[in-house]
Amino acid sequence: FVQTGEKSDIGENLTTNIKNSYRMGAELEAGWSPLSWLTVEGNAALSRNVIKDFDEMASVNFDDSFRKIHYNHSTLAFSPSAILNGFLDLHYKGIKTVWHTNFVSRQYLDNTENITRSLPCYSQTNVNISYSLRPAKRLIGLKEAIFGVNLNNIFNRHYAASGGVYSTILDNDGHPNENRYTQLGFIPMAGFNVMGSVAVKF
């Protein structure tokens, strides 16, 4: 199901089933432990997400009238072609530190594959530090206590992971994309932040 560009009576985006579309890709994963206290891992999801034939119903002059615009072989909305993750895991006795960097490629906000209506690619890094304490003698039945701290987005990247688009044709004469008003909305993600946690096992 994909959004057509039309709205319901209460303003919700209408969707339709696109028969001539496909998603094709591969997932890769690898890991390596060169030392007893060090593990390196990575994974990648690579895909192609295509609508072979798509009709956008674009509003005209902010009105309830629509104009059909046809697209051939456009990319499905919110479908990045690459998602990459890398992990560096250092662990010694009860102390564990995990460095995680991820990358997400460009995502289009609608099915027109218009670069002006897209989320730029982004990358961000988190670090998780934890310490596991197992008392020699159980205290009130306590088996283990894990103290953790998450350092999120440590490089304070400014990026958006989701968003939306509203577009209307201002002049119904001529090419529909030459005189078009577009309004973008982005959902920004948090900058650098710290979270702590405590987990207990009985």
Predicted regions and their residues:
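Gram-negative outer-membrane beta-barrel transporters
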Residues: 5, 10-111
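Outer-membrane beta-barrel proteins
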Residues: 15-20, 116-121, 185
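Residue-level preference for beta-strand/loop junctions
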Residues: 22, 80, 121-123, 143, ...
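Transmembrane beta-barrel strand/turn architecture of Gram-negative outer membrane proteins
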Residues: 32-34, 43, 124-133
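Outer-membrane beta-barrel architecture
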Residues: 39-41, 85, 92-98, 126, ...
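C-terminal beta-signal and adjacent terminal beta-strands/loops
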Residues: 105-108, 131-202
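Short, surface-exposed loop/helix-turn segments at secondary-structure junctions
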Residues: 112-117, 142
